[in-house]
Amino acid sequence: MTLRGLFALAAPQSVGGQAVIEGVMMRAKDKLAIAVRKSDGEIVTEVRPWFSLVVHPWLKKPFLRGFPVLMETMVNGIKALNFSAVQAAEDDEDDTELTSWHLILTMVLALAAALGLFVVLPHFLSVGMEFLGLGGDVDSLSFHIWDGVIKMAVFVGYILAISYIPDIRRVFEYHGAEHKVIWTWEEGKELSPESTRFYSRLHPRCGTAFMLFVLVVSITLFAILVPYLLTFYSPENFIVKHLYIVGMKLFLMIPVSNIAYEMIKFAGKHSKSLFCKIMSWPGMMMQVLTTKEPDDSQIEVAIAALQCAVNAEEC
């Protein structure tokens, strides 16, 4: 799954998107469009306003905007996924979209799962390495090296595991279609399967790259700040100490996401520079796992989503 709406520039021609179930969501400025292929082959489209949390000027400042933009992208993404699930279902008469409370619960569960997998689990596995004599205490470099290695292993392992699920593979194919269509749009070419299929399924502003930046920034920031902050206060009880550190790490994910957002904005804006190409390369390689080659029917859906996003009044 991508968060390109997170990284779209302010220019009118900038677009972003995400793959959904049997479809694609695209964002252009303050509108989003969802296109879904129904079981009978029909492409259903819907245009909606982009829900934004960045309503105050100070939330638009660099190194403050990343976290609220991430949250609003999650809200819009979950809504788009729910719409696509309803439309793609064989029998959608009994299916309804999420209520506000269901949306909040879904977001809380999604955040809890992500933080559990990529913050809490690596921390306590690193504690296990200390018990096995393979690493040091939390204020040592070896602890944070293990923490980083485990985070990366969990991330790659998770992507590899879900890629074997047929429905997820279909989402990855639509992810590839989304990237190809955005490349075609950015190059000013005709939006058709024939002109689009030859473009790369990898894109430097992909949400996969953002997730990788989050991991790298969190590893670096935790290694520096956690030992330093423990000099001010460190609980004596072993369990309380590590629960305190995990809580500290969870709070630090806010500045981590802010920094990662600025990094990917910079990389996207200067994508032709050698430095940014090197910086973006790991994220591009991860997209080999999170995207698959789409067929023409999937490209058609991505084109429909983009056309509705940029010409909302015609859909």
What are these regions (language model features)?
Residues M1-A85, A89:
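Divalent-cation
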Residues G66-T73, G77-A80, S84, T184, ...:
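Low-complexity, intrinsically disordered, cysteine-poor segments enriched in small/polar
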Residues R4-G16, V20, V24-M26, D40, ...:
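Polar-ligand-bearing catalytic/cofactor-coordination segments
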Residues Q87-G133, D139-Y164:
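Hydrophobic alpha-helical segments characteristic of transmembrane helices
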Residues F83-Q87, L111-G136, V214-I245:
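Juxtamembrane "helix exit" motif at the C-terminal ends of alpha-helical transmembrane segments
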Residues S100-G116, Y199-I224:
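Transmembrane alpha-helical segments and their cytosolic interface motifs
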Residues K241-I264:
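Alpha-helical transmembrane segments
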Residues G77-A80, S84, F118-P122, S126, ...:
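Alpha-helical transmembrane segments of polytopic integral membrane proteins
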